[in-house]
């Protein structure tokens, strides 16, 4: 594979990492809201935040798997050159 294609793949990998980092930041913000709810309970908001937290966690796991698979593909391409 030519170097331009590898650079394109590495750029895509950086974007995937950015997506994962953004999702992790969302989880952190959700955790802040959940913590605030200890002082000001709101059952509906707590339930919504639990769902949002789970969805964001699932997204992080999915993106992490995609990143791992994509890194393997990049490494295989680098080796095959």
Residue ranges, per PLM feature:
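Short, glycine/alanine-rich amphipathic alpha-helical segment
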Residues: 41-59
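N-terminal acidic leader/helix
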Residues: 2-35
């Amino acid at each position: 594979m030519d170097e331009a294609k590898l650079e394109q793949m590495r750029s895509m990998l950086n974007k995937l990492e950015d997506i994962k980092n953004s999702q992790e930041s969302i989880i952190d913000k959700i955790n802040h809201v959940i913590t605030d709810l200890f002082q000001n309970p709101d059952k509906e908001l707590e339930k919504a935040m639990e769902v949002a937290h789970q969805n964001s966690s699932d997204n992080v796991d999915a993106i992490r798997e995609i990143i791992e698979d994509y890194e393997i593909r990049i490494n295989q391409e680098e080796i095959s050159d």
